[in-house]
């Protein structure tokens, strides 16, 4: 269920017409082998689009930012493969620890592999910040898709961030303020 004040925060999707890569920043992991519902929603949306464009690659972003001893990217990649995406189409960006780094390292992969139509796939509450960060970094000719999800407690310090739809919203508003203060957006 959407919160009454979400409408002002959400940005409309900008769907691609011929995507060659989907960039999926992790929202969080529940444990060593399970993404949280928001991250699952992102992966499932990307996999749905991959089925329409099977030549495309999925770039799973985020290192071990929860100190689980495994990268979020590897857990996300395994989930995508279970959904039927061939491992040859899944790229693990496992160095990043935050949104800025997700997009920085993803941009390097996009340039190295000569992808032409990158598409961000994010939680709907996260899209505004991810798109603003990408624009500030100089991304051009990119697209975005948003996945809806309820919250679910994540492992460790991300527990409160992902606990509920309300805490996801609150976190994103505060993260946008922080991103403005540090110059990421």
Stretches with model-predicted labels:
Residues 161-185:
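A transmembrane-helix-recognition feature enriched in membrane-embedded lipid enzymes
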Residues 2-163:
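A structural signal for short, hydrophobic/glycine-enriched beta-strand patches
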